[in-house]
């Protein structure tokens, strides 16, 4: 901060620097000349230090480099993709196309400790699946070349690779991909947040040990078993694999109130019948009653139990197809019956005597069982059926069913209907679909943030034949189709089925990224490019998105264009509708002090002005800073 002006950071947080600052606060005696004195720190922690020669843990080639990949700040940003968004102005859901390592770094500022649940279904390292680039130093540059945003000087480079079984670093390559992403993901979880990771036998042992290190062994919750195929292959006489793992860890297990797998029901089924009661009639809606009768039609008339069925009843899969009435010596009135049903009680009819019993749901719940209930979570064939139902063709292979994802999401968010759910290996977008479906079921307002690399669809795939060029494009379409289908449901009215779409991109602002041995001509050209703080082709919305992200705002802020004092502005409102930010992002036109005074008089919480908009007029900048300070307004430049 200089002269009351705050400067927007050019990169994401530097975790090494932040950790050192935290150590300085905790143990100032371990800081010498502004640096951490490791020997002094060891001396202070002597009784708690593990002998490194006998330490237990998971080690592999490249681990230190992978850790540095997580700690290295990035200048990357996200650019709004209005064309591929749905309900941009109102939605709170986010779809991001890009390399998830870079994206996770970008999300650190605002979404730190804000995510309730993370679910990921990463590559299983089977020797056939896609592996993210093992390139840490130039991750963003490689990504930009891969997606065609910059050229590679004629050299064809690809981010994708196959981690084949003959690779001598087969397991370490996969671990190097996962480790930095998990480190960054943990930062985003709320203190009572939970992560679920689907995996098969190829890497479950290694993944478990990595998660023990990243999250702590004490925060392990369960290794859930999902029966992924109800009809396994019969071709092998040695193995018939039909299950996968879902590893679950908490950020801080001691803060969890519990996970919800099922509601605990009271034992027994009290009858609604009492012989001393007068005859009365009750009417039952179809979803109030569970029949333990064979499917079929049951005629109206008096039953041997003493009850009279007033209307014909058709039972299908344990439910009546329409409402019906019973007359008998019941202890409940119609009003009391309706209140009990509203409170969660269900009626059970066990035989053709049509005697009604009550089943009350207790307030307590049961945690999920290790073996996930097949009748609630479905298998991969259910996932295939969902894709066919939306697209008409199997454009994704082996997608996770939304029933599985709904079960997992509900287990953590049943008491937090406004939770944010993150999936940074979005794939077929089952997680986003599941969030929308669960909101429709229980009236929740959960939001999703999903990230997917623009991995090309195989040339010989059905998806490619249908014109879908990337998995990211397919995923967006799946969310769109799922949202449209859910909006047609009786319970789908009011569900936020839109999403804001963003793409990973290089910064919109000039940056220093030249090597020390650069040729003189190239250096001069780069210095000339630094004269402007922003690139000429960046739009105001692109500039504002990057600035807001690096200042800690979300990807779903209420942003609009506005004119004030003759200046074209971008305006950001808070939840109450008040002006939080006014941004002037035109470096070509220098504003006058009177025009800037109009901004301060609004007054917003914060004013953002491009540095080059002052065009070197330090007096104008200083006067604006003094005006802002007098009104309690923060002045930021970029």
Regions found by a protein language model. Name each.
Residues 1-119, 124-180, 610-614, 631, ...:
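DnaQ-like (DEDDh/DEDDy) 3′-5′ exonuclease domain used for proofreading
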Residues 437-638:
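PRPP-dependent phosphoribosyltransferase catalytic core
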Residues 229-233, 242-245, 252-388:
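Active-site-adjacent helix-turn-beta-strand microarchitecture at beta-sheet edges
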Residues 3-4, 60, 100, 134-144, ...:
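Conserved S-adenosyl-L-methionine
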Residues 140-155, 159, 362-403:
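Active-site-adjacent "gating/activation" loops or surface patches in catalytic cores
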Residues 114-131, 211, 421-435, 548:
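Conserved proline-anchored active-site loop of SAM-dependent methyltransferases
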Residues 114-194, 202, 218, 244, ...:
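SAM-dependent methyltransferase catalytic-core segment centered on the flexible catalytic loop
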